[in-house]
Amino acid sequence: MHVDADAFFASVEQRDQPALRGIPVAAGDVVIACASYEAREWGVRAGMTIGQAVAACPRLRVVPLRPAAYDAASAALFAVFRRFAARIEPGSMEEAFLDTRTTPWATIDQLAAAVQRAVRQEVGLPVTVGAGRTKLMAKLASRSVKPHGLRVIHPAEERYLRPALLVDELWGVGEVTRERLRQHSIRTVADIGVVHPEHLRDIAGTQMARRLAAIAAGTDDATVRPERPRRSFSVQRAVPRGTPVDVDGLVAELAGRLRGAGLTGSVVSLSVLYAGNLEHHGRTRLGEPTDDPAVLAAAVGPLVDAATARRIERVGVTVTGLQPAGAAVQLTLDTGY
C-alpha cells in the first residue's frame, strides 16, 4: 500500500488556519515550496518565485514555511501508519509504502479506506491511498487518483493494465532512460517484454535492465523495507533566475527536521547545479553538533558565496554527522569527515 499526503505543506497550513481552507494557498519564502490544489488550478507550481506565483494567481495567499509544524505533522502521520502496517518504508516526510499483508482486515479496499479515514480524523490531513500487488502498482494507483483518492489495483486488473503501461509512467525510471527507450521504439511495458536481455542492457545499463525486465515479467519489487536510522537530512530548492539562494529558508527547514527527529548534526554539505549541468560541491565541519538555524546559516553562507561564480539553477544542503540532541561529544582534529 502507498499512502501520500496531498500538498503536504499547504495542507498543514490549511489545517492550522481555517481561513485558508478552500482558497489558493502556497507555502514558501523566496520561492514556492508547495502549492495547494486550489492554487495549482491557477498554474502555481513549486519552484516559482513568489512574484511569478502571484502573477499567475492574484488571489494567492502565500504563507512562510513552518518546518517544525511539518515535522510534527509527519510524526503524527507515521504514527498512524505504524498502527496499520507491520513494516513501513518512508519515501519522504509525507509518504510511505506500508506492508499490510499481515494486517487483519476484511478486504484491502476496506483497509485502505480505514487508513485514509484515520489520518483525516487523527492528523487532520487529506491523503491519497493506492494499493497493489507490487510497489509499482501501489504507486501507480495512488498517483492516478490524487488528491484524496483511493484506488486498489487488484491482480485481475493488473493483468491487462501492466502490458499497456507507458514507460513514461514507470516509477523509478529516469528521463534519460526513458528517452533511450523511446529512441529504440520501446514505449510500453509490452515492448520491454520482447526486447532481448542483452539489447536491453545495452540500452539501459545492467541494473536498470534487470528492473525493467522484472516489471515486464510482473516480478518487480514488492518488498517493503523498514525504516533505517537517519544518516542525513537534505533540502533542495530550485533557484529562479535573478534571485539569490534562500539560505535562511533552506536552513530553517533543515533545523526543523533535525529538531523534529531529536537530532543534531556536525557536518554541512552544499551541492550546486549550474546551467549546463555543471556541478559544485562544498563541505564544512561545525564546531559542535547543532540544530540551531543561525549556526547552520553561518556555515552555509560562505559555501554559497564560494559557489556563485555562475548562475545557480538548483541548490541542496545536507547535514550529516547526526547524533541525539544533548549528547556531549568533544570533536578533535583527528576526527575526520
Give the ranges of each region predicted by the language model.
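Gly/Gly-Pro- and Ser/Thr-rich, intrinsically disordered tail segments characteristic of DNA damage-repair
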Residues: M1-R211, V319-Y337
